[in-house]
């Protein structure tokens, strides 16, 4: 836990919401928000970032089924399939339940998807369109922050 005079940061997720192997760690933050990490040395980042200061959210109901080197993870909002090894489009995908269509939307590791864009810091001196960085919403139901 990190503290200062203004706020408390809890950048480490709940242990009961974490699925971890020697080189991977998946932390469920909500039923539809997951942090996925892979490191060859098995040393994972536990400090707060500029974007995320708190990862200690409420407990999440989920189910895990081990599959060879990997697993399948289920919540009421997503289905994650991880085959093991480094993250690639062939080893990691996520199906968002109720995403783009009645069958959901599948995201494969490395895909950018159909991101809807983020927010502008200011609209001062903007006349018309302004460029936006990627945001946290997409038309497919899956987006990523790296």
Spans of features found by a protein language model:
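Short, Gly/Pro- and small/polar-rich lid/capping loops
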Residues: 2-13
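A low-complexity, Ser/Thr/Gly/Pro-enriched, surface-exposed linker/loop concept
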Residues: 2-4, 29-68
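Catalytic and substrate-binding clefts that recognize carbohydrates or anionic sugar/phosphate headgroups
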Residues: 5, 64-146
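Short solvent-exposed loop/turn micro-motifs enriched in small/polar/acidic residues
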Residues: 12, 19-20, 57, 64-66, ...
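Generic recognition of long tandem-repeat/solenoid scaffolds
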Residues: 17-21, 36, 69-76
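A residue-level signal for beta-strand positions that form part of recognition/binding surfaces
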Residues: 18, 23, 33, 141-142
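Long, contiguous hydrophobic alpha-helical segments, chiefly transmembrane helices and signal peptides
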Residues: 19, 44, 135-136
């Amino acid at each position: 836990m990190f503290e200062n005079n203004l706020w408390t940061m809890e950048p480490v997720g709940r242990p009961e919401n974490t699925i971890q192997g020697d080189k991977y760690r998946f932390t469920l933050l909500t039923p539809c928000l997951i942090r996925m990490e892979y490191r060859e040395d098995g040393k994972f980042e536990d400090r707060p970032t500029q974007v995320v200061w708190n990862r200690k959210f409420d407990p999440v109901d989920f189910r895990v089924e081990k599959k060879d080197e990997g697993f399948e993870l289920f919540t009421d909002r997503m289905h994650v399939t991880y085959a093991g090894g480094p993250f690639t489009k062939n080893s990691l995908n996520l199906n968002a339940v109720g995403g783009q269509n009645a069958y959901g939307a599948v995201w494969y590791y490395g895909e950018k998807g159909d991101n809807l864009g983020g927010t502008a810091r200011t609209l001062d001196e903007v006349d018309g369109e302004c460029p936006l960085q990627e945001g946290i919403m997409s038309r497919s139901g899956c987006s990523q922050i790296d």
